[in-house]
Amino acid sequence: MTSSYVGRFAPTPSGYLHFGSLVAAVASYLDARAVGGRWLVRMEDLDPPREVPGAQQAILETLERYGFEWDGAVERQSERFPAYAAVVEQLLRSGLAYACTCSRKQLEGFAGIYPGFCRDAGHAREDAAIRLRVPELEYRFVDRVQGEVRQHLGREVGDFVIQRRDGLYAYQLAVVLDDAWQGITDIVRGADLLDSTPRQLYLQELLGLSQPRYLHVPLIVQPDGHKLGKSYRSPPLPAEQAAAPLTRALRALGQRPPAELAQASASEALAWGVAHWDATRIPRCATLPEERL
């Protein structure tokens, strides 16, 4: 069975894969393979100062040990900077973006919503971030798991950064351009990115790009409520006995694997997941406590 489905897993090499990463990888992989779709791997290495040496290779080796097989070459965002630069220039020329010299201190007290201080200031680009003007509109989309999501860009976000003051490109810009460039039809990722999606929809609309389908899976969190991640020193995935974490990830996604699957090989665990995948079973919540899994 083949289909037009193209999915992707896009880790950030600021550390090694942990259980939360595995849940996202399993969800995106099974959602693609269950319908005969393609599954790509992309390194979101936008921020070199935060990248851990050797993490990219370690991530790929972990995916292989856990039975994942991706299609095509691994793409890297660090190789796409000229494409991002061209779009930033296009948006500046059209008046849809502008230079912003605001410091973090100036923006304290605005709850992350940009107040528009530089919107009509006409600053030069030197030593400035680039922000995208947003409309006073509510954006709406229906997530395959989380349901209807609404966000008023003007009131809840404000003009947002597409290129940082240090010249590095923002995630919101890069992810939209790369998903379009790679022909991604379905984005399956963690619910921590649900709030970013309306900004991405707006960019897709501005640039005349097609809108993929979205599925945001619950985020695995620690007892203190923080998500599993490199910032909180979450343990990396074990190198051996991959089927046990894979089976646990299947349970986190609402699937019903037999207990004995934890003793199988990694490829057998993923094959079971592909054969029995049912996205409607994924819990409709933003977070899942790790200790309950």
Swiss-Prot record:
Cofactors named for this entry? Zn(2+)
The reply on keyword Magnesium is no
**SUPFAM superfamilies, per this entry?**
Nucleotidylyl transferase
Specify which residues bind L-glutamate according to the UniProt entry for this protein: R8, F9, A10, P11, T12, E44, Y171, R189
How does the cofactor attach, per the note? Binds 1 zinc ion per subunit.
Q: Name one Pfam family in it.
A: tRNA-synt_1c
Q: Which domain of life is it from?
A: Bacteria
**Enzyme Commission number(s) of this protein:** 6.1.1.-
**Motif position, 'HIGH' region:** 11-21
Function of the protein: Catalyzes the tRNA-independent activation of glutamate in presence of ATP and the subsequent transfer of glutamate onto a tRNA(Asp). Glutamate is transferred on the 2-amino-5-(4,5-dihydroxy-2-cyclopenten-1-yl) moiety of the queuosine in the wobble position of the QUC anticodon.
Q: What is this protein called?
A: Glutamyl-Q tRNA(Asp) synthetase
In the UniProt record, the gene name given for this protein reads: gluQ
